[in-house]
């Protein structure tokens, strides 16, 4: 049986810990220095729900000056981890723009996503409540998890949860629908005879 591969993309503002989460998952260690990412790709074989699969994770630039690159990697991603820092209100406020761009580029009403509030080990510096994260995820219709790359808290749950969301979409596509926007509502398509 062929091994399944999942193309995951991690998005969010600069400095929220996207690379730290990814490296913690892939290499089991925490990077504490901030070195802005332009784009890095990581691969790891894992077993999720008794199924061996390969995670192909694209760690993206959060800085606005790299926003032109986003459309390209959003086209190729099957699912997205949207990360904000619980210590940064502005990073939380940016999340909706990332989601809207993903939906626009994918030309779908729904795309597999997980919302992650990172740096939950810094509770004394919290600017975004857990409830606010839960409410936003509920509005998006996606899972929510608070993570800490430093403490390795909910790191696997975040990425594995996204794989489960992708699997749900694949099952939904087989049943019909697939979340694709309907462009020809009420118009009969041409038939070749």
Curated annotation (Swiss-Prot):
Binding site for GTP: 12-19, 59-63, 118-121
Domain of life, per lineage: Eukaryota
Residue positions of motif Effector region: 34-42
Keyword annotations of the record: Cell membrane, GTP-binding, Hydrolase, Lipoprotein, Membrane, Methylation, Nucleotide-binding, Prenylation
InterPro entries linked: P-loop_NTPase, Small_GTP-bd, Small_GTPase, Small_GTPase_Ras-type
Residues bearing PTM Cysteine methyl ester: 190
One of the record's GO cellular component terms: plasma membrane
Membrane topology of the entry: Lipid-anchor
Catalytic activity: GTP + H2O = GDP + phosphate + H(+)
Positions of the propeptide removed during maturation: 191-193
EC number assigned by the record: 3.6.5.2
SMART domains recorded: RAB (SM00175), RAN (SM00176), RAS (SM00173), RHO (SM00174)
Broad class of where this protein is predominantly found: membrane
Gene Ontology molecular function: G protein activity; GTP binding
Location in the cell: Cell membrane
One record GO biological process: signal transduction
Lipidated positions per record (S-geranylgeranyl cysteine): 190
PANTHER family linked to this entry: RAS, DI-RAS, AND RHEB FAMILY MEMBERS OF SMALL GTPASE SUPERFAMILY
Role, per record: Ras proteins bind GDP/GTP and possess intrinsic GTPase activity.
Family: Belongs to the small GTPase superfamily. Ras family.
Protein name as it appears in the record: Ras-like protein 2
Phylogenetic placement of the source organism: Eukaryota, Amoebozoa, Evosea, Eumycetozoa, Myxogastria
């Amino acid at each position: 049986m062929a091994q399944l591969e999942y193309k995951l993309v991690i998005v969010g503002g600069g400095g929220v810990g996207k690379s730290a989460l990814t490296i913690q998952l892939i290499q089991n260690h925490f990077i504490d220095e901030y070195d802005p990412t332009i784009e890095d790709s990581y691969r790891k074989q894992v077993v999720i729900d008794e199924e061996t699969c390969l995670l192909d994770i694209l760690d993206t630039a959060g800085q606005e000056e790299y926003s032109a690159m986003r459309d390209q990697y959003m086209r190729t991603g099957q699912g997205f981890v949207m990360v904000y820092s619980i210590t940064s209100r502005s990073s939380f406020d940016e999340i909706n723009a990332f989601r809207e761009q993903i939906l626009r580029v994918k030309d779908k009403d729904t795309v597999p996503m997980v919302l992650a509030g990172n740096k939950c080990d810094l509770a004394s510096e919290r600017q975004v409540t857990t409830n606010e994260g839960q409410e936003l995820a509920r509005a998006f219709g996606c899972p929510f998890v608070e993570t800490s790359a430093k403490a390795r808290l909910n790191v696997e749950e975040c990425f594995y949860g996204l794989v489960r969301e992708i699997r749900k979409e694949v099952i939904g596509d087989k049943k019909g629908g697939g979340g694709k926007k309907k462009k020809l509502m009420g118009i009969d398509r041409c038939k070749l005879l």
